[in-house]
Amino acid sequence: ARKVCGDALEMRGGIGYIEEFATPRLLRDAHLGSIWEGTGNIVAIDALTRAVGRHGADSALAADLHARLNESANVPVAWRNRLRELTDRAVGFAREVAGRIDNEGDARRATSLLYHVASAVALTWEGGRIHEMRGDARRLLLARMVIDHRVLPGDPFQLAETATQRKIT
């Protein structure tokens, strides 16, 4: 939120920072979240220890993601199986991190992986439904890009965009 509000101020050339528009209020509100909630790492630790460690929300999340993949019969089986595997790995990693206080250093990575895998599953589920209605499979491609760019390890010596990805975009 802070980045978006800051970019909005820059787009207006700084105009709006002093109460001409709603932007300064939005910027202040965006900063309040991190002030009240704490840094991303603290929020990640809290989310894992409470949601996963105490309340078992990881099981509900995994069940929902698997159900969405099961509902996506028109999505290629290989892609659904890959997402099932990544879902299980992300949930397992979150459980491992939540299981011991010594693992707090990995909390941000665990919550980010859960987020990215859940996003890819949601995009796949939506993409399958949209493809059935309109023949548009772009969300399936976006799901693939989320996994490629946010979950799978990248080679720092490789171009950021492959030939396949250039065709997609």
What are these regions (language model features)?
Residues 1-169:
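Flavin-dependent oxidoreductase catalytic core characteristic
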